[in-house]
Amino acid sequence: QVVDAAMIDGVAAMGALVAQMRAIRYWSDDPAHNFFLHSSPFYESFVCADGRFVTLGAIEPAFYAELLRRLELDDVDPARQYRSEDWPALKARVAERIRSRTRDEWCAALEGSDACFAPVLSFDEAAAHPHNAARDLFVEIEGQRQPAPAPRLSATPARSPSAGVRIGEHTDAVLAELGLDEDAVVRLRAGKACA
C-alpha cells in the first residue's frame, strides 16, 4: 500500500472545522474577522493595496534574508532577525511596503521564491487554486465543499466526508436517546437551552 500524505492534505483536513462553520455561516471569509496576533514582522498577515491579504512565514534566517531582499528592505540587517526590540518599527515598514501593491502583484513578485510567502485565500479561492485542484483537495458533498480525507491510502481509500448538519438537526434524537420525553424537550426549547 502506498501512503500519499502530502502536507497540504493535512492543512486542508485541519480546515474541516472552518468548512463546517462556513457551511452554517459562522465563518467570515474576511481575514479582518479571523486573525491571530503576532508581534514579529516575518510571521504575520499583512493587508495589500487592494484590501486583500498576504501572509509571511520566514522564520529561518535564509528565508528571512530572501524576504528582505524581495521586499527591497536592503538596509535591514538579517542577522538581527530575532531582536524583538526591532520588531515594532520593522513591522510597520513591512506593512507599509506590502500596502504598496495588490495581492496579485505580490504573488507575481514572490511566488516561487524562498521568501516564505503566500496569498491569503478565501475558502473558494483555496479550492480553485491550481495546486489544490490538481490534488483533488476538496470534494463536493450535497452541495457543500469539504476537505478531502487525508492521508490518501492506495489500498484502503478513506470514505468521503459527510455533509455538515444544521444546528439543532439531531436535537430530538439525541435528547430522546438520553431519555427525555417530548414535554421535556419542549421545555428545553422554550427556555432556549437547546436548538
Which ranges hold each PLM region?
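Active-site-adjacent "lid/gating" segments in soluble enzymes
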Residues: 1-54, 58
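Aromatic-enriched alpha-helical interface/lid elements that frame and gate functional surfaces
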Residues: 37, 41-113, 117
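Helix N-cap/coil-helix junction residues
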Residues: 73, 132, 180-181, 193
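Flexible, small-/acidic-enriched active-site or ligand-binding loops
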Residues: 78, 141-189
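A glycine-rich dinucleotide-binding beta-alpha-beta segment and adjacent secondary-structure elements
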Residues: 111-161
